[in-house]
């Protein structure tokens, strides 16, 4: 599979409690067929984070990869925006 044809998503890290694994919440919008209203859909993906760099609240980009475990099918590409800790 060519690297350019892999799925790439951008989302927010909602959990980093696992070792080398983050949970990313990806929100998308779909248009209702009948009424045309935009409806928000969200899905959680587990992604591989080798250096444990991503923290909760960060906006990250993940890319599809080979299965790394039972649930992990994505890997961390980059941290787009770091969370502001107050």
Swiss-Prot record:
GO cellular component, one term: cytosolic small ribosomal subunit
Record Gene3D superfamilies: Nucleic acid-binding proteins
Positions of transmembrane segments: none
GO terms for MF: rRNA binding; structural constituent of ribosome
GO BP term (any one): translation
Alphabetical UniProt keywords: Ribonucleoprotein, Ribosomal protein, RNA-binding, rRNA-binding
Functional summary from the UniProt entry: One of the primary rRNA binding proteins, it binds specifically to the 5'-end of 16S ribosomal RNA.
The family this protein is said to belong to: Belongs to the universal ribosomal protein uS17 family.
Subunit composition and interactions: Part of the 30S ribosomal subunit.
Protein name (database record): Small ribosomal subunit protein uS17
The encoding gene: rpsQ
